[in-house]
Swiss-Prot record:
Organism ancestry: Bacteria, Pseudomonadati, Pseudomonadota, Gammaproteobacteria, Alteromonadales
Name of the protein in question: UPF0227 protein Shewmr7_1806
Stored InterPro entries: AB_hydrolase_fold, UPF0227, UPF0227/Esterase_YqiA
Origin superkingdom: Bacteria
UniProt-listed Pfam families: UPF0227
Record family assignment: Belongs to the UPF0227 family.
Organism name: Shewanella sp. (strain MR-7)
Gene3D superfamilies hit by this protein: alpha/beta hydrolase
Length: 179
């Protein structure tokens, strides 16, 4: 089972396409949708929804996959549920990058402060990161510097921020899920 968490652009048709691509790894791909506008409510909703969905699966190794803002949540929700996660162009600091896009971006900083201390250290090797060198939204080099002590990083030379084509990485994602 793969949980797919969309980015800030929840209605993008690219989300459906990425889910179809992930079905080459596991036919059971589930979209876990969230508002993107209310971080505290989103966290509660995502925790409840993932716990509920896990009750209906016998997969011994479910995987969280998120893009952009979805990767922010995949890392945290995956950690809190003991799941591996794949972070594609993760938005590590939405309290900064979401300024002007949502009403209360500071809620992300509050969530980070209340999260388990040093959670990445405790989550080492339980996530893999795929970064675009040509990300048109985030500073992928800064993201790599923040995450490389904890997670393996794969670099892509072509894909933009929303990362529409996962095909090249499907074998690595599958190996990570099963490994």
């Amino acid at each position: 089972m793969i949980f797919y968490l969309h980015g800030f652009d929840a209605t993008s048709p690219g989300n459906h396409e990425k889910m179809r691509q992930l079905q080459f790894i596991d036919p059971d791909v589930r979209l876990i949708s969230y508002s993107t506008l209310h971080p505290k409510h989103d966290m509660q909703h995502l925790l409840k929804e993932v716990a509920k969905q896990m009750q209906y699966s016998d997969d011994p190794a479910p995987l969280m996959v998120g893009v952009g803002l979805g990767a922010y949540w995949a890392e945290r929700i995956g950690f809190l549920n003991g799941l591996k996660s794949v972070l594609i162009n993760p938005n590590l600091h939405p309290e900064e990058t979401m300024q002007g896009k949502i009403d209360r971006p500071e809620e992300y900083a509050d969530i980070a402060n209340k999260c388990v201390s040093e959670f990445r250290l405790k989550n080492t090797h339980k996530a893999m990161c795929i970064l675009s060198r040509v990300d048109d939204v985030l500073d992928s080099q800064a993201t790599a510097e923040a995450l490389k002590p904890y997670y393996p990083i794969e670099w892509d030379e072509i894909q933009p921020h929303k990362f529409p084509q996962l095909a090249t990485y499907l074998p690595k994602i599958k190996a990570f899920k099963l490994g």
